[in-house]
Design a protein with these regions (language model features):
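Conserved phosphate-binding elements of NTP-dependent enzyme cores
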Residues: 1-180
Length: 180
């Protein structure tokens, strides 16, 4: 349109609607149909102690979720923090010999912060791993046990079924994205 045009097309407004849905929308659990709520570190810790009692689990901090890029700097950051491995697209990779990632391919990168057996003797270590992993994962941590992953979130958790959800992303509301 011209300089004085005030007509907006749906395509122009759509970007703002996606942001509006993410920032002001209320996320609901698809199973229970109730709004999801915030969960404290202590609640996440208690849930882990109950769910994985007697089992060996690995704490994973999701650093990159379905994003394009090289991420060499992430390997350097992890190495400087004392971590020797990252999980890149499901494969364990050394931070010393981090591969060249395709810039135009979406990647998932997780930081394994620790592996521990869930017992009362290890409560202190588990509490510390919960805090560190939530910090690195920006409020989200994954638990891996025998190849199965479960997400715990301090920002969106169902009060009924205790299922956690990742934070909303504008890409979820886009027909141009494979996530939406």
């Amino acid at each position: 349109g011209g300089q004085k045009s005030t007509v907006a097309t749906m395509t122009e407004i759509y970007h703002f609607l996606r942001l509006l849905y993410v920032k002001l929308g209320t996320q609901y659990c698809p199973t229970c149909n109730v709004p999801v709520i915030k969960q404290s570190k202590d609640q996440i810790f208690a849930s882990i102690m109950k769910t994985y009692k007697g089992k060996e689990i690995t704490f994973l901090a999701p650093l990159v979720k379905n994003r394009k890029g090289f991420y060499k700097d992430l390997a350097v950051w992890a190495r400087n923090k004392g971590y020797k491995h990252l999980i890149v697209d499901g494969e364990k990779v050394s931070t010393l010999r981090f591969p060249s990632l395709s810039r135009f391919t979406e990647h998932n990168i997780d930081l394994p912060t620790g592996t521990v057996k869930v017992t009362p003797e290890n409560e202190g270590e588990i509490k510390q791993l919960v805090a560190v992993t939530l910090d690195f994962g920006k409020g989200i941590l994954d638990i891996e046990q025998k190849g199965k992953k479960r997400t715990f979130s301090s920002t969106s958790n169902c009060p009924n079924c205790q299922k956690s959800f990742p934070e909303l992303d504008p890409r979820l509301f886009s027909y141009n994205s494979k996530h939406g």
